[in-house]
Amino acid sequence: MTTQVRKNVMDMFIDGARRGFTIATTNLLPNVVMAFVIIQALKITGLLDWVGHICEPVMALWGLPGEAATVLLAALMSMGGAVGVAASLATAGALTGHDVTVLLPAMYLMGNPVQNVGRCLGTAEVNAKYYPHIITVCVINALLSIWVMQLIV
């Protein structure tokens, strides 16, 4: 007969807070800091303006400035990174509050498929021939959400 130790509510709360803090500092924070550093490097070198100019015609189809493409590219790699890129671009004045609001659902619908392909799909033994289809669906969902958000906001 095993004895089960029961924790009180306060102990469970403190344990959950510790785990949450660990997740935030080891998983989320490095992505956000990396995104800020990359955007600052792109800005200092002038590449951010170049990317904005190159992507402007395509992003204009969704009513967004060209720099918004960097948020979507970051979302392919990391959701936390995409949030960091969006925050950095908003701070720099390249994106307005409206632009960030429109991009937010797209960042989450994109769902960092590059990480998921390795982590989730590989572990679940999904056939690799379906990876491009899965990533394409993520991108299409994200782009459609931008149009929907432009109508709503």
UniProtKB/Swiss-Prot annotation:
Annotated localization: Cell inner membrane
Keyword entries, A-Z: Cell inner membrane, Cell membrane, Membrane, Transmembrane, Transmembrane helix
One term under GO cellular component: plasma membrane
Topological region Cytoplasmic: 53-68, 111-132
Periplasmic side: 1-31
InterPro entries found in the cross-reference section: Gate_dom, SpmB
Membrane topology: Multi-pass membrane protein
Disulfide bond entries: none
Any Pfam family: Gate
UniProt record similarity statement: Belongs to the SpmB family.
Annotated protein name in UniProt: Inner membrane protein YjiG
Annotated source species: Escherichia coli (strain K12)
Lineage: Bacteria, Pseudomonadati, Pseudomonadota, Gammaproteobacteria, Enterobacterales
